[in-house]
Swiss-Prot record:
Protein name as annotated: Nucleolar protein 9
Keywords per UniProt: Nucleus, Repeat, Ribosome biogenesis, rRNA processing
Keyword Nucleotide-binding: no
Gene that encodes the chain: NOP9
Disulfide bonds: none
Location of region: Disordered: 22-54, 654-697
Biased amino acid composition, Basic and acidic residues: 35-47, 654-691
Primary localization class, coarse: nucleus
GO process annotations (BP): endonucleolytic cleavage in 5'-ETS of tricistronic rRNA transcript (SSU-rRNA, 5.8S rRNA, LSU-rRNA); endonucleolytic cleavage in ITS1 to separate SSU-rRNA from 5.8S rRNA and LSU-rRNA from tricistronic rRNA transcript (SSU-rRNA, 5.8S rRNA, LSU-rRNA); endonucleolytic cleavage to generate mature 5'-end of SSU-rRNA from (SSU-rRNA, 5.8S rRNA, LSU-rRNA); negative regulation of gene expression; post-transcriptional regulation of gene expression; regulation of biological quality; ribosomal small subunit export from nucleus
Keyword Nucleus annotated: yes
Alphabetical list of PANTHER family matching this protein: NUCLEOLAR PROTEIN 9
Matching InterPro entries: ARM-like (IPR011989), ARM-type_fold (IPR016024), NOP9 (IPR040000), PUM-HD (IPR033133), Pumilio_RNA-bd_rpt (IPR001313)
Amino acid sequence: MSQPRCFMQDLIVSSSPENFSITSMGPKVRGRRAPNRETREAKRQEDLVEDEQISEPTSNLTTPFFGLVDASEIEYFKSAESTLNVTSFESTEERDAFINSVLDEASGKELKLVTNQICSKLMERIILFGGDQQLISIFKSFSNHFVSLAHHKYSSHVLETLLVRIAGLVEKELARSAEDAADQEVTVEHLFITMMQEFYPHINEMITHQYASHVLRLLILILASKKLPSALTANSTLRSKKSKIARKMIEIKDNEDFDRSFETPPSFKDELKKVCKCISENKTMKEMRELSIHKIASPVIQLVIQVEGLVDKERSVWHLVFLPESNSEDPQEEAFVEHLLSDSVGSHFFESIIKNGGARPKYIERLYKLYMKDRIMKLARRSTTGVYIVQALMFKLRPNEVEFILDEVIPELSNLVSIVDNQNIDLGRSVIDASISRSNYRRDDIISQLLSKFAPNFNPKNPSQNDNYDLLENTLLLSSSTLGNTRDDWPTAEERRNALFLEKLLDYDTSFLLAVWTSFLAMPKERFLQMCFHGVFSHVVEHALAVIPASIGESKEVNILRKRLLNVFQGSIVSLACNAYGSHIVDKLWSFTVLMKMYKERFATEMKAESHKVKESTYGRLVWKNWSMELFLRKKYDWSQLIKVQDEEYHNEGAEAETERVKRPIELKMEQLAKKNEKSSLDSTNNDERNKRQRIR
């Protein structure tokens, strides 16, 4: 048991050379932020100076210092950045005039501005809003300094945005007539290629640089005419996770040039070939494999493998990482593949080159047969590494190999997927998708495995007997979730992921749909309504309000279950309609009450009784419109006709689905056997007739 420390002990500790602070002497200072104020202020001043300088975390590149921005200039540019952020311009011309005035003030200071933390945001906004000539002017001002800017913490982001906009200008240039192109002194294509000449001597440094590697990846995408992902998406190729969060916080949004590909001239393919050559030449297999599992370089090598086939039929980079397809098993390659299958960076690299289509199918099949086929289950149990490779293989191998993987995984699916431990949830989704792609291969086994895991007490043949909500608890973990919290907690990422998984199950088979209905009925009504008002779980409720198609048919027991679920909503329609999340559920109730006009009238009557409250709410007005409540109030017959049309469409869809229904594999196989038997019987009949004729003769 530790003894309490006295004041003198604290004084001695705080007075030691490494811990000495002003708090060890003088009067006691109140508050946690008061101590070390001078030290923090000095550190802040040092950071400001460092922010102005070129950051080079992993490069030996000697970069210039472009100078500090004056305090008065910072205030002006900060004000200009705020003005652009608000976008309170009456016209595009007014905004262009404002940008021109800012660029005039920034003339000759561009390099100093883009390497400043505050002013770099202004430059990025100007590039997003700027016109063609303004972009070209900024691009020219960066000439001979592109390498330095690519290696800087702040200017690298500005450069990425500029490159995306310049790619759009290159496409515009290609669409112009020959006369318009002749009037232009220097083409944007020429400017881009000139910039590439600056980068070539430094390509190998950029591969492993914290900031320049992102610029290099963007250059490769542009040269290959590939889609340039949005800088705000979760899996963006352009930005790191921290950068995407920062852009959202400072409200910098992409324009129409992002999240699309651009047409490029033939000369860009030559430049892409040079980039691939710079990366592959003079490198040994050991060096390339080290880059493949390098935290920063790995995404670059993934991208090069994806695009090198456009300009290099020999696939030089691929064959510096893996042996040719003609080679048999190799101990060194086996050790490298094992590292890829067990390392977080390596598994991400391996998954990417399998999924993104850069490698030829025969290359992937060779690696699979040599090093993975015999231990699929072992890899599937590696929930943070190998399982992602197994998932990727399900959609890239030949059908017979996909079925082999499914045969290995499906019997153990209930043991592999764990919501509580946050393991292999994506594997469950991938198995379902792979089964569907193979004409619902072993569908019943998958359903059985997942039901036994998440709803062990549910009987699909007699769903009404279910008196618990195991399925909801086991998939959404409601007891430990933010459901019912009064602290306005935001839904967590885990809750979103679990909800999406449950929605996947609801779409897969009606057994899960009925299990969720009975779970809703087993819950206390208050708890169920909390789900309806929850930012994530409300989507599950909305998704569960699906009627079994008429082609399958709704049994009497299922019809009763649907009515019981609708009864739960009675008395809460108005509060749901006026809520941001609940309003979507009320909208969905219109289709969920098909063939049940009585429930439609009950819910409409509830909204009519509190029409003022519903109409005063933004969400309530939308529900009022979607339910055609004005017709309900003034033209009840017309409202009833809408219901009649809905019921007829439901029956018609069922009839069409019955006539156009895709036959199941077992049905096709039975038809083939029937035709085969018919043919054999016909042949035997013909043979008998021939024998009879021969006897007669």
